[in-house]
């Protein structure tokens, strides 16, 4: 928590900047599909492993050896704790600034559920022809922003189509227009960045 707050102090200028509406904390963090094997591979003195053992004990589950199924039940509380700690740090260091999540790209559905109640806006990097967020439940009352996208073309600049390729600048413009239209058509999306 103290590291989060210390790093946020570097952005103290944002408190009074009328153009800074919010802040992302992280970018495309690696979230495994299953947390059990990840926790089991951590050294015994790692904070996350210590937290997991403590939680298993609290739940009356065996801890030696911890069962993968039991560890999986900790994924949602782990994600909730992550987003909650980030939100608390933003509120303490940058009051009045929206917390925009961590710009997820890939990751399990637990991310959207775990972010509910902590993020002001759920951010997701979508390198596709249209916006989407499979992590956030359809019925969740949370705004979503597409925090990164990419449409490359081979006719100018770097000779690579990049993450979402187009043949030329015209197709690139049409791809972006389609992408933006898909965001406008989905009431959950509040913008693209």
Could you tell me what each predicted segment is?
Residues 17, 116, 186:
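Acidic-histidine catalytic/liganding microenvironments
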Residues 26, 34-41, 150-153, 159-163, ...:
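Aromatic/acidic polysaccharide-binding cleft in carbohydrate-active enzymes
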Residues 1, 68, 157-164:
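Surface-exposed, active-site-proximal loop segments in enzymatic domains
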Residues 20-22, 26-27, 163-193:
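Substrate-binding cleft of secreted/luminal carbohydrate-active enzymes
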Residues 5-12, 87-91, 180-184:
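Non-transmembrane alpha-helical segments in soluble domains
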């Amino acid at each position: 928590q103290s590291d989060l707050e210390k790093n946020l102090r570097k952005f103290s200028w944002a408190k009074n900047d009328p153009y800074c509406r919010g802040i992302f904390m992280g970018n495309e963090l690696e979230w495994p599909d299953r947390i059990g094997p990840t926790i089991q591979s951590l050294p015994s003195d790692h904070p996350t492993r210590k937290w997991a053992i403590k939680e298993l004990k609290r739940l009356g589950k065996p801890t030696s050896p911890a069962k993968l199924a039991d560890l999986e039940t900790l994924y949602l509380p782990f994600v909730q704790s992550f987003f909650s700690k980030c939100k608390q740090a933003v509120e303490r260091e940058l009051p009045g600034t929206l917390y925009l999540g961590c710009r997820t790209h890939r990751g399990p559905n637990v991310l959207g559920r775990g972010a509910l109640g902590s993020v002001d806006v759920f951010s997701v990097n979508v390198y596709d022809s249209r916006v989407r967020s499979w992590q956030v439940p359809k019925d969740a009352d949370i705004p979503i922003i597409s925090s990164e996208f990419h449409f490359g073309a081979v006719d100018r600049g770097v000779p690579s189509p990049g993450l979402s390729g187009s043949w030329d600048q015209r197709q690139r413009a049409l791809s972006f227009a389609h992408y933006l239209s898909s965001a406008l058509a989905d009431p959950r999306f509040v913008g693209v960045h």
